[in-house]
Amino acid sequence: MYSLIFLALIGAAFGVPLSTNEDSTRNQNLAALYVLPQTSYPTFYDVRLFIDPGYTEAFHGNVSIRIIPNINIDQITIHAMAMRIDSIRVVSDVNPNEDLFSDFTLATDDTHLLTIRLTRNITALQPHVIHIDYVAQYADDMFGVYVSTYEENGRTVNLVTSQLQPTFARRAFPCYDEPALKAVFRTTIYAPAAYATVRSNTPERRDSLKPNEPGYVKHEFEDTLVMSTYLIAYLVSNFNYIENSQNPIYPIPFRVYSRPGTQNTAEFALEFGQQNMIALEEYTEFPYAFPKIDKAAVPDFAAGAMENWGLVIYREVALLVREGVTTTSVKQNIGRIICHENTHMWFGNEVGPMSWTYTWLNEGFANFFENYATDFVRPQWRMMDQFVIAMQNVFQSDAVLSVNPMTHPVYTPSQIIGTFNAVAYQKSGSVIRMLQHFMTPEIFRRGLVIYIKANSRAAAAPSDLYVALQQALDESSHRIPKPISTIMTEWSTQGGFPVLTVRRTAPNADSVFVAQERYLTDRSLTSTDRWHVPVNWVISSNVNFSDTSPQAWILPTFPATAVDVPGLSNADWYIFNKQQTGYYRVNYDVENWVALARVLNNSHEIIHVLNRAQIVDDAFNLARNGRLHYKNAFEISRYLEMEKDYIPWAAANPAFNYLDIVLSGANSYNLYRYYLLNLTAPMFEDLGFDVKSGEEFVTPYHRNIILDINCRFGNQRCISRAQEILQAFKNNPNQRPNPDIQTLVYCSSLRAGNVENFNFLWNMYLGTSDSSEQSILLSALGCTSNAERRNFYLNQIIDDNSAVREQDRHSIAVSVINSSPEGMNVALDFVVENFHRIQPRVQALTGTTNILNTFARRLTTSAHNEKIDELVRRHESIFSAGERASIAAIRENIAASIAWSNSNAGIVENWLKENYGPPSGAKSLTAGLLVLISLFVAIFNH
């Protein structure tokens, strides 16, 4: 399942630390309540569904489950949810005429247990079949089987589809709804003739096994391979498709389904998807197992996409590319999501997790390969360079004491959905990337080949992965200090990550001391967690960044380790963690930071681009954390005036955004704005608004960073040009802005409060059915500074007649929160007042957590904390587990921001005054001009 879910659940990565004994007892109690008893298991399901999208309340179904008792039993416990059980029969192969069913109970709590009691004991290992007739409710939150709609020629068209991961197959049919309890599935869907496109995981059968039913067309599908319940999928619609039958790149039938009239937007998915499948098959040395691949784009979908085996379902914006409308970023995201889901065909489908405790075995590998395997077929996208930026971002959520580790026991449905978070995705993917480099890429690949072949169609635990990787390592000449299982168990069962502090043992020595400790945002907290940390380095006298295998290991058993670095005595500077392949931060002695600033400002291209990004990111975050003086971070940042590569700018941008937030309202804020305008001036001239011939694929991202800083912080040329572009578009619809700068152009044109511009863009939103364009407009509309229009926009979240789909409504709040400090405060008041109305009107499970997590990144003061207190007082009784975790994250971040201001605001102000305040020489701003810029910014923003 792609990361639109986990991005909204970053807060759910946080938990309440318990003692070992408390944790163990709690887990035992939860397991007893929620985990199915290991007294029987399924081998085969025969599911019949009667689905009419025109009837939106419920559907009828029946299922026959062939089971094997492990012991003699007199009751069978499975899962069922949100359904009425009409009849149950239990029969054996030995005597199929004897019905052993006595009675049943269906739990009304979130255990969702259906307990079937029998008239007598049934014997261990004797196959039996459970027959159940039921009526199930369509899900109203897009988790389960649900009805979606779209507009076509002025009329509303219905379709039915599904999202069963992680615990919602039980809403489609009674089943053993745990990932390890795999079986073969036979599916038959009866649908009205008006719905011609009916799909499931396998192709339709050529023979007929089931009777016809009046008023329905029967669609019988071939039996699946052994698979988990959560991978079953359905689509009943009028969709059309394009396919690879005429010119196949990939030898298996490959189709892309979408709304009628959108088939031209599916061409990229068809081409890229096939190319990527070939690359993954070659890498894994294991063929895709199913006889077809369908990709379907549906208008309403809870996740970004879902890897159902043979029928992968996507949100439209995650699959369809419309030339001239889809941005470079969205197109890249579509490629990455396609690769993510393709990867799951091996990591998740072919080899699945033993339980959702090991969600990272699915999502961590999918996160890694969505970048690594996209790089195979689109190297110009620089996905593995961009991966480092994503890793730096996840450091933020992984730097709190309460964060859960990769392997984290979960039992309840809410706990399980909470595992689909930044830890399971981006952190796990980052640790896997580190694993690849410390094993070396080819040995790592060989280990994965062994893993997939050894565990095909089975349920795996991390230990199974480690055994396979160890075998590949043992068959090579490469050595590491401890077994894979020892090293990886530390990384997967401990939350957080280390910071290494490296300093020379003596001025002329050829060695360094390296100390590790857990990196925590709140330094008043402590942790004894330690790791086996692979390290490598570059010194100024021997600049080689290409070999990323370990040159040494920092062991968890020693507080500090002396590491020999030959040639260091003759080196001006040194860098640890080549290409930032290790999942950790690095701090240095002050002399080395000064030397790094010097080399960056004199000849930055000597240093690998990923290490330039690492140095910038580490420096600002270590300064934020009180481990480094801000002067050192700012001196390093000066080199960015000369930096023409996107990646270091992408690393710097979050630090600049953080300082923008915490300095807002401070005496130094206008100096800070001038510092950024000065820093970005060369790239503003170089990039401008217009695309140039031969630009890199990632240049649009770079342009957006530079233009955003300049338009937001008062560069009149930037603001005027943005307004000119929008006005030209208003005058002539054929002069549509370049999609890559549309959000920036629209947002900049709204900041002045122009009502006409807002209404123009809102009417654009109402008039488009393209999901990419809708996303751009939703992101921009929150930028308005007009109070009446902003309130109108926020109220679209709770307006039952709003044109904004529920799955997108959280974007309204996110847009307003991110627009400006004023917008954030208005949005905070709105959420405090209306949380009980927002919660049922945004996407279930993720909408409100997405909003709260956006606040977590922006709330900084004690006044904000008081508002959160009010939110809790008024609405705590309806908070979900994810919402509670997000509130905890908000409080922690506010406390950290207050502490930052107390410790660092004066330091930052002094540096800015010394370097950008009057009178400080050639680079300084005169007092009069500073006043003018301050006045203009104030007028423009208000």
Swiss-Prot record:
GO CC terms of this entry: cytoplasm; extracellular space; plasma membrane; side of membrane
Where on this chain does Zn(2+) bind? 340, 344, 363
List the carbohydrate attachment sites: 62, 121, 544, 601, 678
Keyword Protease carried by entry: yes
Pfam families linked:
ERAP1_C, Peptidase_M1, Peptidase_M1_N
Q: List the disulfide bonds.
A: 711-718, 747-783
Record: residues binding substrate: 304-308
Which GO BP terms, alphabetically?
A: peptide catabolic process; proteolysis
Q: What class of enzyme is it?
A: hydrolase
Record site feature (Transition state stabilizer), residues: 425
The protein's UniProt keywords, in alphabetical order, are:
Aminopeptidase, Cell membrane, Disulfide bond, Glycoprotein, GPI-anchor, Hydrolase, Lipoprotein, Membrane, Metal-binding, Metalloprotease, Protease, Signal, Zinc
What reaction gets catalysed by this protein?
Release of an N-terminal amino acid, Xaa-|-Yaa- from a peptide, amide or arylamide. Xaa is preferably Ala, but may be most amino acids including Pro (slow action). When a terminal hydrophobic residue is followed by a prolyl residue, the two may be released as an intact Xaa-Pro dipeptide
What this protein needs as a cofactor is: Zn(2+)
What membrane topology term does the record carry? Answer: Lipid-anchor; GPI-anchor
Listed under subunit, the entry gives: Binds to CRY1AB5.
Task: Give the similarity note.
Answer: Belongs to the peptidase M1 family.
This chain belongs to the protein called: Aminopeptidase N
Organism, scientific name: Manduca sexta
